[in-house]
């Protein structure tokens, strides 16, 4: 493996040849492994602590082979030197030494985690996330870029901070620059949860680096469960409370949405008394806009917290009406299925 990466395995092959003409005795090879590799295994009588491989005697033109398997544990240039000695006259000492070098490219082991400040969040309130990017080395992680992937309809006004004090609006990506080996960077996020959101909200972060040999966990996500905190107030009044048969009664209904969250699927139900009122001829308006005939109920849809809707209902009192008119309105929503009355 002449182009190993960090933590790869290398197999060194050492061949000793007696070129003759005489027999060589007590042949010994010295190969003390360099820093940057870790001994895994070998063939032959090799001692990794001393670097000595005792070959013994070699006849003329006889050879012996040693294989050493190591693991790369650092980056950069790693050179392995070897030499051989033996008893007897050696007419050529220039070939008793050899070396081989490998160049291990820069490498990083990165990890990113994302944790929410709470796994249960109320719609309409703020959620916070803490993102930690760690470089376990061995090299510097250069040009680290962090991206937060979120649904802009669920999380509003997303901001980030590198110190928890100074906040900036998030815009597509954050350039974290270089992260040294053994160091980490913490990024804080905060956003307002849309008041109309319910259920799980998934948020994902990922990182990239310009280091070619990058490993580890480059992405993480966090899911929070969004619940509602809503109130519905309904107020009903009559414009004139003293009326006669044949007059038109004007009911005024005001619906107010409160709480931290928006009220979803608000429905107003007002059944007029057909024995006292001309139900078929009743009309209504919403926030001052005439809507036509009143059929007994209306879907107000989603109401933002802090907003109000006014519904006016007009109906003629029948000529046969002979008693007081009692009228009740009920307003329901997803969070208040039983409704509130007035």
Residue ranges and their predicted role:
Residues 1-342:
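Exported/extracytosolic protein signature
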